[in-house]
UniProtKB/Swiss-Prot annotation:
It comes from Saccharomyces cerevisiae (strain ATCC 204508 / S288c). Pfam families: CRAL_TRIO, CRAL_TRIO_N. InterPro entries: CRAL-TRIO_dom, CRAL-TRIO_dom_sf, CRAL/TRIO_N_dom, CRAL/TRIO_N_dom_sf, PI/PC_transfer. The gene is SEC14. It is a peripheral membrane protein. This is SEC14 cytosolic factor. Residues 99-272 form the CRAL-TRIO domain.
Length: 304
């Protein structure tokens, strides 16, 4: 079961993925998966949980644990404990990242429009990181708070709006990680943040990666990835693309030219008076046609 408030929210956008989506997603279940879903929900209800028991959420935890019901239950319970301890349920109201306009200059991270499958596209320019300047205006703790803030905004605002725009359930994002200009020292400087961010993503927001493009990858990066591929989950590997400096053609296969920023080979430009590429946050979640009962996505900072 879900709460009445959740029910009204879930009914405001599509709840099934398209038929060609991965097995184990809403609308694409076999009988064994349906049985596992019902079993997991019953176990969690019996344990006293009343929120986040919708099909989409529970199936993400099940997929993350290969439909092992007991392991999925443990993962869900650990996530709920973390949410309570971290204050995740109220972070969109409680946390304000007023230093974001400055941080965007030293570690650009932003969402911009959607890919051909309706996913919000997330850009992270890891090669442009300048930890020395970042440390003058923020801390790793606040950066991680902002990461969780963004995840909650994705779940509560971006994905529902993208689902309405696409006409089917959108559960994942498309990530573009740009390594242009990266050095061993700059990569090492943010390793602690990246490690913690990865832990949060994998354990508390499972199965949110739709496509992952690493562009401007240094020489040897692809070779190293091939060495590790046999140890990675095949489904995860199928979502990851390692590209060098000639990446535009591949990106345009997944992202319409009108949605891909000019700097990455597309045609999308953003007026600096509206925040520019880094701060404008353009997508269906800003379009009144696709905003539902949740309202427009909040801002973590003030543009004033």
């Amino acid at each position: 079961m879900v709460t009445q408030q959740e029910k009204e929210f879930l009914e405001s956008y599509p709840q099934n993925c398209p038929p060609d989506a991965l097995p184990g997603t809403p609308g694409n279940l076999d009988s064994a998966q349906e049985k596992a879903l019902a079993e997991l929900r019953k176990l969690l209800e019996d344990a006293g949980f009343i929120e986040r028991l919708d099909d989409s959420t529970l199936l993400r935890f099940l997929r993350a644990r290969k439909f092992d019901v007991q392991l999925a239950k443990e993962m869900f319970e650990n996530c709920e404990k973390w949410r309570k301890d971290y204050g995740t349920d109220t972070i969109l109201q409680d946390f304000h990242y007023d230093e974001k306009p400055l941080i965007a200059k030293f570690y650009p991270q932003y969402y911009h429009k959607t890919d051909k499958d309706g996913r919000p596209v997330y850009f992270e320019e890891l090669g442009a990181v300048n930890l020395h300047e970042m440390n003058k205006v923020t801390s790793e703790e606040r950066m991680l708070k902002n990461l969780v803030w963004e995840y909650e905004s994705v779940v509560q605002y971006r994905l529902p709006a993208c689902s309405r725009a696409a006409g089917h359930l959108v559960e994942t994002s498309c990530t573009i990680m740009d390594l242009k200009g990266i050095s061993i020292s700059s990569a090492y400087s943010v390793m602690s943040y990246v490690r913690e961010a990865s832990y949060i993503s994998q354990n508390y927001y499972p199965e949110r990666m739709g496509k992952f493009y690493i562009i401007n990858a240094p020489f040897g990066f692809s070779t190293a990835f091939r060495l590790f591929k046999p140890f990675l989950d095949p489904v995860t590997v199928s979502k990851i693309f390692i590209l060098g400096s000639s990446y535009q053609k591949e990106l345009l296969k997944q992202i319409p030219a009108e949605n891909l920023p000019v700097k990455f080979g597309g045609k999308s430009e953003v007026d600096e008076s509206k925040g520019g590429l880094y701060l404008s946050d353009i997508g269906p979640w800003r379009d009144p046609k696709y905003i539902g009962p949740e309202g427009e996505a909040p801002e973590a900072f003030s543009m004033k």
